[in-house]
């Protein structure tokens, strides 16, 4: 069934603490705001929530008539319209409203920055989560489970016995490593020692190095090998902390009803703190003063004044540059992905070296157990940073793992990053969503933007064990 949140949200947002309204009952455009946010993607909604909590007067507009922007979840009819034009979906796929298909398929690290942000802002009370069944890696033509326990590690065919002993010594070093306690560093300075040099001290073979970098540290490519090892060690620690958090088969969690719930949760937060929302606002043209600083936004002939503008790249196309493309396949299936222990939610990482690519490919699958499809249906995604224009052949290694599919859709979108100087023009533009299957890069961008906008940093070192609100639903 469709999420209860999606029906209530527009009503809540318009009812809660909205500013003065004009004769048509619309929020007044002729007001001055501290910040106008354009686009209701996840990044923009987190920011409008955080800024509203800070006491800033926020107006949030979107040219679409739905929340989520590029990071929305579509029902079956919307999915069909986007990829197949006017055709109606076949009846055997079930009810349209039972589908919530993510446009940016990502899982959440259970101990990661997005979960910490949700707890910090108390948005957890608007959402329900469930652990993800399994995390797998593609190696030598086969799918292997990424070990989640010592016993699984001992039995795993990913490494031979002697290699397992060497790897265990390395894992113990990582587990004990505390940046603030030099006694745990064993005389190594991980801010200068590269990842390659650190791993070499343990004599691990290339396949293990590949596994550590891509399946545990979740790097997208191999640049990390020549960069300081501290980042990789922190990423490995995040993986193991996330894994330990729910004693599940993976370090990931995922919201019931899909990722479209996340922007809506933060939109509710903003509304509770006095933020104003306007959807279906065509054009949304940013206005600049004589000094080139953003000073307002015009839509339908009315201008709302502001001190700062926050937006996604599509609202200020002359201030961003293209940095790549994401290739993606979306499959509707009637079975779990083969060779994944019948998992109803799963991630498979295909490291670049296994495919002869320059960056990893990701397979992501969820199903009716997370309320994103009717009973018996599974939604699978294959995504990668595009390295060619032939999307079907490029994604073939991932699609081949899926088994028979009921429907298959292909999509490619450009990725952009800002090139402006925010302190000169007061425009704060988010970076497009990448191909990774988790939200760490997403939230890093948001927190950096928050600091640029406010000059403050958010302390996310919350005690997660105290976050009972988040735990109840697991």
What are these regions (language model features)?
Residues 16:
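Short polybasic linear motifs
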Residues 25-162:
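N-terminal glycine-rich phosphate/pyrophosphate-binding loop and immediately adjacent elements
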Residues 64-69, 73-78, 132-137, 213-218, ...:
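Short amphipathic alpha-helical segments embedded in low-complexity Lys/Glu-rich regions
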Residues 253-255, 264-268, 272-275, 281-408, ...:
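Mid-domain catalytic core of redox enzymes
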Residues 378, 388-474:
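C-terminal catalytic lobe of FAD-dependent flavoproteins
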């Amino acid at each position: 069934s469709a999420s209860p949140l999606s029906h209530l949200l527009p009503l809540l947002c318009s009812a809660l603490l909205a500013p003065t309204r004009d004769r048509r009952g619309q929020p007044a455009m002729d007001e001055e705001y501290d910040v106008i946010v354009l686009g209701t993607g996840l990044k923009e909604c987190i920011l409008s929530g955080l800024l509203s909590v800070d006491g800033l007067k926020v107006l949030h507009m979107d040219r679409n008539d739905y929340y989520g922007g590029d990071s929305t979840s579509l029902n079956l009819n919307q999915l069909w319209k986007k990829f197949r034009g006017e055709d109606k979906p076949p009846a055997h796929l079930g009810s349209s409203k039972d589908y919530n298909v993510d446009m940016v398929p990502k899982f959440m690290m259970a101990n990661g920055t997005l979960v910490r942000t949700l707890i910090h802002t108390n948005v957890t009370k608007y959402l329900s989560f469930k652990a993800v069944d399994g995390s797998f890696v593609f190696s030598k033509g086969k799918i292997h489970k990424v070990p989640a326990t010592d016993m699984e590690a001992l039995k795993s065919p990913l490494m031979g016995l002697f290699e397992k002993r060497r790897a265990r010594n390395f894992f113990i070093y990582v587990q004990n490593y505390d940046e603030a306690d030099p006694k745990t560093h064993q005389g190594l300075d991980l801010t200068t020692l590269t990842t390659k040099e650190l791993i070499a001290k343990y004599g691990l073979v290339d396949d293990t190095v590949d596994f550590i970098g891509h399946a545990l540290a979740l790097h997208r490519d191999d640049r990390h090998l020549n960069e300081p090892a501290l980042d990789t060690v922190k990423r490995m620690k995040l993986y193991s902390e996330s894994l330990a958090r729910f004693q599940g088969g993976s370090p990931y969690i995922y919201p019931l009803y899909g990722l479209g719930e996340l922007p809506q949760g933060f939109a509710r937060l903003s509304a509770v703190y006095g933020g104003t929302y306007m959807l279906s606002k065509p054009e949304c043209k940013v206005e600049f003063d004589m000094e080139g600083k953003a000073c307002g936004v015009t839509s339908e002939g009315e201008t709302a004044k502001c001190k700062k503008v926050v937006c996604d790249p599509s609202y200020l196309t002359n201030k961003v540059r293209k940095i790549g493309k994401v290739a993606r396949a979306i499959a509707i299936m009637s079975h779990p992905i083969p060779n994944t222990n019948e998992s109803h939610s799963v991630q498979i990482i295909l490291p670049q070296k296994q495919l002869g690519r320059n960056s990893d490919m990701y397979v992501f699958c969820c199903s009716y157990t997370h309320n994103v499809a009717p009973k018996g249906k599974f939604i699978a995604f294959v995504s990668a940073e595009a390295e060619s224009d032939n999307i079907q052949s490029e994604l073939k290694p991932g699609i081949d793992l899926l088994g028979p599919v009921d429907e298959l859709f292909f999509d490619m979108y450009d990725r952009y990053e800002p090139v402006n100087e925010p302190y000169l023009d007061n425009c704060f533009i988010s970076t497009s969503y990448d191909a990774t299957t988790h939200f760490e890069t997403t939230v890093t961008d948001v927190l950096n933007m928050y600091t640029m906008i406010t000059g403050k940093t958010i302390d996310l070192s919350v005690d997660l064990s105290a976050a009972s609100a988040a735990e109840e639903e697991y």
